[in-house]
Regions:
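Conserved short alpha-helical segments that host acidic/polar catalytic motifs at enzyme active sites
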Residues: 1-353
């Protein structure tokens, strides 16, 4: 008896490591329904063994879901506020009390309109004492572009690259504007954390256990809260202290962390920021710098950079291969050739001026 399970399916004993719990469920037809949201929460609960708690057993290191925005659900919310818009983005905010005017000024300066604020319904009694003691105010801010022709029926359009250099993808222009708005809010305020700010996706997360998420956020139990996919994450905090902000998913990724070369990567990034150029962002590029700010986890930093690459026009697989290049197998001499397709891309990226 060696204590190991036999190889079966995708299971390999040599890949056993401590790790956060990450999962995803999606409807391959692209149809949004509430069943997908429920299955996402079921996956999350089955990843409890991948999470952790501190001294308070009811306060988890973090749990959350990343989903497609349920436009029908939020249109009901807007109708109740006498605000109407066929297309809009939603910013999910932690904190920001007393900074509403600054936030609204940022939105207006980017040519967008504030449709209204919403206090997200929450149940503090469903979470632990420690999490409740540091719980931020949780709100949603609804944002519309003043150019309605550019964003008609966003929720019905097929997801595509964010690049619209050809001028045929105005949806991407609005999505990129929301990205710029988020970055400017982060710089203009001290106590506001933006979980997500998008016309496509939304994040519900917190300093929670997987079993608490649905109870804490009643929105997730509403039959009209639908999505074609759900990305879930149960956090096991190792190299950063657990906080509401550092719970996953982030705006674009849910990640295991433990990036050993993070300091070197961030130093190299900071050294090259001054030479960055982008035909997609143009003069707006300076609004989103620095790309990564201090005090984040390694996964949060990766999310910042991945988000920028996709917003600049690269597709998600391309951006991820740039950031986490595949490790090629050694050749017959036991060395890795820099002429291989993967390492060739990597060396050209890291050594190009």
């Amino acid at each position: 008896m060696n204590g190991k399970y036999e190889q079966q399916g995708l299971y390999r004993s040599e890949y056993e490591h401590d790790a956060c719990g990450v999962g995803m469920v999606a409807n391959l037809s692209g149809e949004a329904n509430h069943d997908i949201v429920e299955k996402g929460m079921t996956i999350l609960k089955r990843l409890m063994h991948r999470g952790a708690t501190g001294n308070d057993p009811e306060t988890g290191d973090g749990a959350g879901l990343l989903m497609r925005i349920p436009h029908g659900f939020f249109k009901k919310v807007l109708a109740a506020k006498n605000a109407k818009s066929e297309s809009f983005g939603v910013a999910m905010l932690f904190g920001g009390e007393g900074e509403e005017k600054k936030i609204e000024n940022v939105i207006k300066s980017e040519g967008c309109e504030v449709l209204g604020w919403r206090d997200v319904p929450v149940n503090p009694d469903a979470i632990g004492h420690d999490a409740r003691a540091v719980m931020p105010k949780i709100r949603q801010l609804f944002i519309a572009t003043k150019n309605t022709e550019n964003t008609k029926n966003i929720e019905n359009k097929e997801l595509c690259d964010l690049c619209d250099l050809c001028g045929k993808n105005p949806e991407a222009s609005f999505e990129r504007r929301l990205y710029i708005i988020r970055r400017e809010i982060e710089k203009a305020t001290k106590d506001t954390y933006v979980c997500s700010c998008s016309s496509r996706t939304i994040v519900y997360k917190g300093l929670l256990l997987a079993t608490q998420l649905e109870k804490f956020y009643p929105d997730l139990s509403d039959p009209d809260f639908i999505s074609p996919f759900a990305i879930v994450h149960q956090r096991y905090s190792t190299n950063t202290f657990p906080t509401w902000e550092l719970a996953h998913p982030f705006r674009a990724i849910a990640h295991n962390g433990e990036i050993n070369a993070i300091k070197g990567n961030l130093t190299a990034l900071a050294a090259r920021e001054a030479s960055l150029e982008s035909p997609t962002f143009g003069d707006d590029l300076k609004k989103i710098l620095p790309i990564v700010h201090g005090g984040q986890s390694d996964s949060a930093s990766l999310d910042n950079i991945f988000e920028l690459l996709v917003a600049a026009g690269r597709d998600a697989p391309h951006a991820m291969m740039m950031l986490v290049p595949h490790s090629p197998f050694p050749n017959s001499e036991g060395t890795i050739s820099v002429k291989s397709p993967v390492t060739g891309i990597w060396f050209s990226l890291t050594h190009r001026r």
